[in-house]
Amino acid sequence: MSKWKFPQYATMTFIAMLLLAGCAPQQQVSQQKYDALDTEYQQLNRTMSKEVAANQMQITRLQNAIKVTVNSELLFPSGGWQMSAEAQQTIGKIIPILAPNQKSKINVNGYTDNVPIGPELMRQGITSNLVLSQKRAETVMQFMISQGVNPKLVSAQGLGEADPVASNDTPQGRAQNRRVELTVAGSGN
């Protein structure tokens, strides 16, 4: 039995070395993705500094993603879902930073406050805040696609009054809850 110990230990050591060597490139790729995401985050803050300073937009660095939160007032008229020219210009400045290599998945989520839909919107087929938020998210997604973003890499979801970021008891809180969030996973994902 003792004559088999050396080859066993040698084999196990060799396998362990191979496994460790295989981890190094993965760590390097992960660091490259993190660095690319950090660069995008910094670019967004520089490019959108006016909107961020005016509290129209918030840019958040997550662990493996960037989230851009845009107040609905910047994008849509009250109760509406068609983007203004200013909104198109704003989203147009974000697109080259969020989707430079057309490899990153972009999720567009629409949110509303909890104020019930009025009769005018009901006549237009908007039966709930969920439907309104879906239309808004889809409008932003369609605009992004019209600007060259790969349709396979962008999705839209309306979440209505779910996940409020502020109290719906005040006009300021309701304004904060009416938003669109664009979340992009790390570059190259």
Please give the residue ranges for each predicted region:
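Post-signal peptide N-terminal segment of mature Sec-exported envelope proteins
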Residues: 29-60
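Bacterial N-terminal signal peptides that target proteins for export
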Residues: 2-13
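C-terminal motif of bacterial Sec signal peptides marking the signal peptidase cleavage site
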Residues: 18-22
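Periplasmic peptidoglycan-binding/anchoring modules of Gram-negative envelope and division proteins
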Residues: 46-54, 79-110, 114-116, 141-145, ...
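Periplasmic OmpA-like peptidoglycan-binding domain that tethers envelope proteins to the cell wall
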Residues: 111-189
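Extracytoplasmic
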Residues: 52-54, 63-65, 69-71, 93, ...
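Bacterial signal peptide processing site
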Residues: 24-27
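Short, solvent-exposed beta-strand/turn patches at coil↔beta or beta↔helix junctions
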Residues: 63-92, 113-127
